[in-house]
Regions:
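Conserved donor-binding/catalytic core segment of Leloir-type glycosyltransferases
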Residues: 170-183
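Active-site-proximal region of nucleotide-activated glycan assembly enzymes
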Residues: 31-32, 53-54, 114-166
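Cofactor-binding loop segments of dinucleotide-utilizing enzymes, especially the Rossmann-like FAD-
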Residues: 10, 38-40, 61, 126, ...
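Short amphipathic alpha-helix
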Residues: 15-26
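Glycosyltransferases and closely related glycan-assembly transferases
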Residues: 3, 49-54, 84-99, 107-122, ...
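Short beta->alpha connector loops at strand-helix junctions that form conserved
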Residues: 58-62, 101, 124-127
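Conserved nucleotide-sugar phosphate-binding/catalytic loop shared by glycosyltransferases and other
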Residues: 2-12, 27-78
Length: 184
């Protein structure tokens, strides 16, 4: 059975656009990809019917940060349960590589990659301040990629090829606008 790569993460457009760029690159190289995200947040809207994916899985997960004490306990128990579900999936599909782009959607799949013997975890951190999940799991990662870390092997932000294919050179620039943020 061929190896399958898992791309995980999301919740907001900032994480999902990076996941999309990874999926596109793997797809173009003929590598089978499974996306694991959350049924809460924007993940389903982005990848539910994506033909590039071997499978798209949306777990009923929620974040832990900003929850009250009992809510945190319930979220952590839920993450544990979903981590076990991901471990079974990794065995079924011979997953040996997981790419995490962070966000609460990535927790279960990321923890499962740490628990699975022989599975490599790669983390892409797109924010200038590392998110809590990436901060915790980076100690177990094979490598962490970040534009903001001087020690990072890869500093580039993944960009879809269509950006370069549709770009045009203008003689005169009238206005430049920048958009972004955690909501995409």
């Amino acid at each position: 059975m061929n190896e399958t790569v898992v791309v995980t993460g999301g919740g907001t457009g900032g994480h999902l656009k990076v996941a999309d760029a990874f999926i596109e690159e793997f797809y173009n190289r003929g590598i089978s990809v499974i996306f694991i995200g959350s049924s809460n947040g924007q993940d389903k809207a982005w990848f539910e019917n994506d033909k590039r994916l071997e499978k798209a899985i949306f777990l009923d997960t929620r974040g832990v940060v900003n929850k009250k004490s009992f809510g945190k306990v319930l979220s952590l128990l839920n993450i544990f349960s979903k981590t076990m579900q991901c471990l079974k999936l990794y065995s079924k599909y011979n997953v040996k590589t997981v790419i995490s782009v962070g966000g609460f959607s990535a927790a279960a799949a990321t923890f499962a990659s740490i628990l699975k013997f022989g599975c490599k975890l790669y983390i892409h951190e797109q924010n200038s301040k590392m998110g809590k999940l990436n901060e915790i799991t980076s100690k177990f990662a094979t490598d962490v990629f970040s534009s903001f870390d001087e020690n990072s092997l890869v500093k580039d932000y993944p960009v879809a090829k269509e950006f370069f294919n549709t770009a045009r050179v203008r003689d005169k620039i009238k206005t430049i606008a920048f958009f972004g943020g955690s909501q995409g």
